[in-house]
Amino acid sequence: VCGDVCVWKPSEKTPLCGVACQNLWADVAKENDLPEGISCLVTGNYEVGEYLTTDERVPLISATGSTRMGRIVGSTVAKRFGKSLLELGGNNAIIVTPNADLKITVIGSLFGAVGTCGQRCTTTRRLIIHESIYEDVKNKLSSAYEQLKIGNPLDESNHVGPLIDIDAVNAYLNAIKRSKKEGGKIVVEGGVIEGKGYESGCYVKPVIIEAEN
């Protein structure tokens, strides 16, 4: 990657984030007398991604997203003997050992799980906790979850903003339903938030589900 021009496409759901990042890069490039065009932003839907993936002038494709997307990108790039880097279907865990600093554990787990409303590819989805400290960690984390303020992300007093769209809300609800069906125990109740300020239907409560290994 180093030394090459970068052409990148953000998610079609967050084009303005892409524009903001590109503007930051442009400022850095200008301050360091770098030529324009080293980093090029293109926005659009999946068809733009398909165009980049099939273009033989692009020797390396790096893609972050679902495993379904990765299969398509990987096989398409391989057909033209290109190279691909795929980061797919994150299911990240934090392992908590008996000698862990529980204060740092709770802060790190909370931010890892609910930061950006759990929508980063590096979001924490699981905690694997040693039985000797399990109840203590569970109680501390549950207490922290119950103190979260959920609302407009432009209000700095809030900790958690909305999910990106209704599809994400449905995926969240289906995950809770599936967990219950498989024997999961709800520790901190989730659900869609209603009322003034939550009219979009995309604000949800972060949920903790207990599962025996």
State each model region's role.
Residues 27, 54, 60, 68-213:
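ALDH superfamily catalytic-core signature
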